[in-house]
Amino acid sequence: MKVILKQDVKKLGTAGEVKEVSDGYARNFLIPRGIAVEASKGHMKDLELQRKQEEERQQKLKEEAEELKQKLDNEKVVIYQKTGDEGKLFGSVTNKDVAEELKSKGYTVEKKKIEMEPIKSLGTHKVHVKLHPEVTVDIDVQVSEKK
């Protein structure tokens, strides 16, 4: 019997895949638990529609990420931190600090998308921002002394 998986199933497949399984496995386990539905023509059409919608959504997200990349390309972020005697920072500059500074400039970037090691010295540093799995941008972060 062919079924469409609604969830990921170990050793069988991932959600949205059409799989051939034994009748008993489908009727007694997968379908009653809501893990799968029978692969009828109606369900197959629904699956195709969902795939198209997901594709369009992903394309839209990628286009938005490309637009944001264009805006961030020449952006320079300046962060002021307290320093010690020899220019050493008290603490460090993290992705949270960079995200907050970008937010204050009108850009919405989640801190988890900013890939960086904590910055512990003054100067200009390159920071990698992953806007989308296929779209990344490097921005300059200048750490200056707070007076």
Curated annotation (Swiss-Prot):
Signal peptide feature range: none
InterPro entries according to UniProt: Ribosomal_bL9 (IPR000244), Ribosomal_bL9/RNase_H1_N (IPR009027), Ribosomal_bL9_bac/chp (IPR020594), Ribosomal_bL9_C (IPR020069), Ribosomal_bL9_C_sf (IPR036791), Ribosomal_bL9_N (IPR020070), Ribosomal_bL9_N_sf (IPR036935)
GO biological process, any: translation
GO molecular function, one term: structural constituent of ribosome
Keywords linked to the UniProt accession: Ribonucleoprotein, Ribosomal protein, RNA-binding, rRNA-binding
GO cellular component terms listed in the entry, alphabetical order: ribonucleoprotein complex; ribosome
Any matching Pfam family: Ribosomal_L9_C
PROSITE patterns per UniProt: RIBOSOMAL_L9
Biological function: Binds to the 23S rRNA.
Family: Belongs to the bacterial ribosomal protein bL9 family.
NCBIfam families the UniProt entry points to: L9 (TIGR00158)
Protein name: Large ribosomal subunit protein bL9
Species assigned in the record: Natranaerobius thermophilus (strain ATCC BAA-1301 / DSM 18059 / JW/NM-WN-LF)
The gene coding this protein: rplI
